[in-house]
């Protein structure tokens, strides 16, 4: 409360310093309100500078009492909050008081009271005060951490309470006119800026044996660690290792372990995880974690203890990811393996004797966390022997079996299913490292039997309510998925003993059967999981069949059928992101490993138009598939039946395979930055195949066993494969090529010559760099090779020019033909238009009609034969009573010779025996059948 005494004192102070001050604006003041002034909203200033000056004075009688009195009145004045404008001076007063504590213990109370004020709201007079006084506020709050050095338990606890109050801001007890409370997060932000977290971490070293104060500091750090800025500051102050090493300190309340674990959690989440792990990866920290975990594992029975135990295990798992962490040296790895397997494998170790996990949520989570930590630990190879000693493989295999009826299970059905999936996933990581243990436990037989159950129609209701159970609700997809993943991991060890055992147990046939069963029952709902299962099956088959003809024969036509089924997938699905790309990669891998090299399978693949499907995929222009598809085609071209299939293929717009391959070559060269002109012609005949990368790289001397840049270029792009395919198809007989294709084909045809020239050129340049002088004959040979390579380039460039010129001429001729057609079309249109105009003129103008008729008659008359044949019948062209305004068309109906003259229908059809009448008209019957010689005189027709 603002008191009358405080008001009177303030007035006295004001009158006392009036003559010393040059202006009132230079005096930092705070409004001191008396009971009378409060009603009038009038503030009385208090001279804080005088208080500071008073505290700085020494060696005066009664000075201590006076100083304490002024500080007490100061506390009374600010009991409703601290104005930001006065904060710097108030904390200076606090600092002066704390400096006197050592010689004048009575100042502890004054410092305590001022610190208590810091828990009150900060007040601002203007909105801009938060920004204006930000630096002063940050420095003032940072001073709280420095005051932790004062050896006063009461003072330290009050400092901690004050900081905790930052996170639980309360409104002012009383409204002060003209002031408003600073934002609730202002103190927290200023604590971050001032670096309070660092001094609080450092204060931990002063509290080794002072539990109460240590717990308060941990509470403060717990609040501070909710901020990323503070976590970074704490991490740099080595907070992680400092807190972790004291986890085992005696604490009946249990707060130390709880608060410490939460601080470690926050540091791992909100600061540099790698740096925090590095701080915790020392023997002292791991020993502390080990002891805490063992105590909680063996003696923790409450929900709180079990949850804390799991948190410690998660932190340990994160530390175990660091290969430099001495997990084995401190014995933690051995204990974790024991705790992970004691439920499944009996152990006489005293640590687990009489222990049993319940089916509570915390113990269930613990079991999964222990499986997870085994996966992390097995990445450190020295751990392998401990895994063998702990019989981890045997313990995990206890879950790889179908559910048994009438058996008492410690876990619920859902829990057992999740643990089963987790165990199989763990085996996928551990089994490849412990392959001998895996085989001794009959691992292949167990997994194949479990897969057989997964494929069966046995009733089983899966819950699918976990990460590993994703996509497996109401079916066995999750179990099948992880079992196949385990088999894939084992197969890809390429251990012949393991793979032979799998093949003898009929794995190839079983995998093909599972695949066929899956594709016969489409499941769109779980499509992503099904695609992963299919991919794993194909990868397992590839691993088993590679380099084994007999196994490829077992793969046979049924295997080819499933491969072809995948290759017929709608290309649009390749962009769906559901795993079709992975499935297609697996399919192409299975073609390489399971079909190529086995002639019956190759022939069946060709018979079923497999090459067409490969070329269809190649035409999709997916760069990630091109290299693999072309490699497969190179091998397939060794089969004499392949060329006919390749040449018979047609893509969009009747594109041929040769045209497609040449197009891919051009695209590859464009991406590689090979120099070509606009027509695709060689520019640099000395370096016709050089890429932009080769241009940038300088030739350096290399050991004989290191491939040069020119050699590496062969394997790093698809040009060599395209050359090999076109070479096997015969360069001279490639159908469906354009002139542009032929220009590119000239380069492809000489690819090997150019590449040999490149390599010799590198050899020559290396000799120069090493300053070697070859003998005369070698030098001449090198020069001859270089010249020959350049001449080949010039020859190819010349041939390309001829092709381009020939095509240009052909294009010119084609253009002229098209132009001639256009001219003829235009001329025909003009004639048609003129004819139409004439027709309109005749039908609309009588004079024009008469003129046209006159011209027609003249034309008819001019076309007649003027010498009339003897005995010929003359037909009139004019028919009486007929009026027409148009000329006759191409079809004219004419009344011929009357029937009386014809003599009836033609009875005899053997015209060759008849004598034709010379009078014209229709055929007539003649009586004589005697054949006479034709008259020798000429008869007009």
UniProtKB/Swiss-Prot annotation:
Record keyword Cell membrane present: no
GO biological process, one term: response to odorant
Biased composition (Polar residues): 16-26
Bias-annotated ranges (Low complexity): 1-14
Major localization class: other
One Gene Ontology cellular component annotation held by this UniProt entry: sperm midpiece
Keywords recorded for this protein, A-Z: Cell projection, Cilium, Differentiation, Flagellum, Olfaction, Sensory transduction, Spermatogenesis
Key word Metal-binding present: no
Annotated stretches, region: Disordered: 1-26
Pfam family, one: CFA69_ARM_rpt
Subcellular location: Cell projection, Cilium; Cell projection, Cilium, Flagellum
Tissue: Highly expressed in the testis, specifically in sperm (at protein level). Expressed in the brain, kidney, liver, lung, and intestine.
InterPro entries found in the cross-reference section: ARM-like, ARM-type_fold, CFA69, CFA69_ARM_dom
Disorder this protein is connected to according to its UniProt record: Spermatogenic failure 24: An autosomal recessive infertility disorder caused by spermatogenesis defects that result in multiple morphologic abnormalities of the flagella, including absent, short, coiled, bent, and irregular-caliber flagella. Malformations of the sperm head have also been observed. In addition, patients exhibit very low sperm concentrations and total sperm counts per ejaculate.
Protein task: Cilium- and flagellum-associated protein. In the olfactory epithelium, regulates the speed of activation and termination of the odor response and thus contributes to the robustness of olfactory transduction pathways. Required for sperm flagellum assembly and stability.
Protein name, per record: Cilia- and flagella-associated protein 69
Annotated organism of origin: Homo sapiens (Human)
Encoding gene, per UniProt annotation: CFAP69
């Amino acid at each position: 409360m603002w008191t009358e005494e405080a008001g009177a004192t303030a007035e006295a102070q004001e009158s006392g310093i009036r003559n010393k001050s040059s202006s009132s604006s230079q005096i930092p003041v705070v409004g001191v309100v008396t009971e009378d002034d409060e009603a009038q909203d009038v503030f009385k200033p208090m001279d804080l500078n005088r208080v500071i000056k008073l505290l700085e004075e020494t060696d005066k009688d009664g000075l201590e009492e006076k100083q304490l009195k002024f500080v007490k009145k100061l506390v009374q004045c600010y009991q409703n909050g601290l104005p930001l404008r006065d904060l710097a001076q108030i904390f200076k007063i606090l600092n002066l008081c704390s400096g006197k504590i050592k010689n004048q213990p009575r100042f502890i109370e004054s410092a305590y009271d001022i610190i208590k004020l810091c828990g009150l709201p900060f007040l601002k007079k203007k909105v801009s005060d938060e920004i204006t006084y930000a630096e002063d506020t940050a420095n003032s709050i940072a001073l709280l951490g420095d005051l932790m050095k004062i050896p006063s338990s009461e003072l330290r606890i009050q400092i901690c309470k004050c900081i905790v109050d930052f996170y639980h801001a309360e409104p002012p007890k009383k409204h002060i006119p003209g002031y408003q409370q600073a934002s609730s997060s202002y103190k927290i932000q200023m604590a971050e800026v001032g670096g309070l977290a660092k001094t609080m971490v450092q204060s931990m070293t002063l509290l080794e044996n002072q539990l109460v104060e240590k717990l308060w500091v941990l509470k403060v750090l717990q609040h501070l660690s909710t901020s990323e800025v503070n976590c970074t500051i704490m991490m740099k102050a080595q907070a992680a290792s400092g807190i972790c090493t004291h986890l085992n300190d005696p604490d009946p309340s249990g707060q130390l372990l709880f608060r410490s674990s939460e601080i470690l959690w926050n540091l791992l989440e909100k600061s540099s995880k790698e740096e925090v792990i590095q701080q915790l990866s020392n023997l002292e920290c791991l020993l502390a974690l080990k002891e805490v975990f063992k105590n909680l594992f063996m003696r923790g029975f409450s929900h709180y203890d079990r949850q804390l135990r799991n948190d410690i295990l998660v932190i340990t798992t994160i530390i175990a990811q660091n290969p430099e962490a001495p997990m084995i040296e401190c014995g933690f790895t051995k204990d974790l393996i024991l705790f992970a397997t004691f439920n499944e494998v009996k152990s006489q170790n005293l640590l687990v004797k009489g222990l049993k996990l319940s089916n509570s949520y915390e113990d269930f989570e613990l079991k999964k966390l222990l499986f997870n930590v085994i996966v992390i630990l097995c990445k450190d190879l020295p751990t392998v022997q401990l895994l063998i000693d702990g019989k981890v493989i045997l313990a995990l295999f206890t879950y790889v079996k179908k559910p048994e009826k009438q058996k008492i299970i410690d876990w619920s059905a859902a829990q057992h299913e999740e643990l089963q999936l987790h165990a199989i996933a763990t085996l996928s990581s551990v089994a490849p490292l412990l392959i001998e243990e895996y085989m001794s436990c009959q691992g292949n037989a167990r997994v194949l039997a479990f897969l057989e159950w997964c494929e069966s129609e046995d009733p089983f209701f899966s819950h699918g309510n976990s990460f590993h159970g994703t996509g497996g609700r109401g079916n066995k997809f999750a179990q099948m998925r992880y079992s196949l993943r385990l088999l894939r991991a084992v197969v890809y060890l390429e251990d012949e003993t393991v793979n032979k055992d799998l093949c003898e147990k009929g794995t190839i046939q079983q995998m093909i059967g599972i695949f066929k069963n899956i594709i016969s029952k489409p499941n769109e709902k779980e499509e992503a999981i099904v695609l992963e299962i299919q991919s794993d099956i194909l990868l397992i088959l590839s691993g088993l069949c590679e380099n084994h003809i007999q196994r490829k024969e077992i793969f046979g036509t049924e295997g080819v059928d499933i491969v072809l089924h995948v290759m017929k997938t709608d290309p649009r699905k390749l962009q769906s992101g559901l795993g079709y790309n992975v499935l297609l990669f697996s399919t192409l891998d299975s073609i390489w490993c399971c079909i190529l090299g086995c002639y019956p399978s190759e022939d069946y693949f060709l018979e079923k138009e497999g090459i067409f499907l490969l070329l269809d995929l190649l035409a999709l222009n997916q760069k990630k598939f091109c290299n693999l598809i072309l490699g497969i085609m190179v091998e397939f071209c060794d089969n004499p039946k392949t060329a006919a299939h390749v040449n018979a293929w047609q893509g969009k717009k009747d594109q041929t395979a040769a045209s497609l391959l040449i197009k891919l070559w051009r695209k590859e060269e464009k991406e590689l930055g090979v120099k070509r002109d606009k027509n695709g012609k060689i520019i640099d005949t000395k370096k016709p195949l050089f890429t932009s990368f080769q241009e940038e790289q300088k030739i350096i001397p290399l050991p004989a066993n290191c491939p040069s840049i020119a050699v590496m270029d062969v394997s790093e792009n698809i040009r060599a494969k395209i050359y090999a395919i076109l070479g096997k198809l015969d360069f001279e007989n490639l159908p469906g090529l354009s002139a542009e294709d032929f220009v590119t084909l000239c380069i492809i045809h000489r690819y090997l010559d150019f590449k040999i020239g490149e390599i010799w050129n590198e050899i020559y340049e290396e000799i120069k760099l090493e300053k070697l002088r070859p003998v005369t004959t070698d030098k001449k040979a090198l020069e001859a090779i270089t010249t020959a390579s350049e001449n080949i380039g010039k020859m190819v460039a010349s041939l390309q020019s001829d092709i381009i010129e020939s095509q240009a001429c052909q294009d010119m001729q084609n253009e002229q033909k098209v132009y001639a057609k256009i001219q003829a079309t235009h001329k025909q249109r003009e004639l048609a238009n003129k004819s139409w105009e004439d027709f309109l003129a005749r039908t609309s103008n009588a004079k024009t009609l008469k003129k046209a008729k006159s011209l027609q008659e003249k034309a008819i008359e001019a076309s007649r034969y003027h010498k009339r044949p003897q005995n010929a019948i003359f037909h009139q062209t004019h028919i009486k009573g007929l009026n027409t305004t148009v000329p006759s068309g191409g079809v004219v109906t004419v009344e011929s010779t009357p029937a009386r003259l014809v003599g009836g229908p033609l009875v005899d059809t053997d015209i060759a025996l008849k004598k034709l009448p010379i009078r014209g008209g229709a055929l007539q019957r003649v009586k004589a059948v005697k054949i006479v010689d034709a008259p020798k005189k000429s008869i007009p027709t």
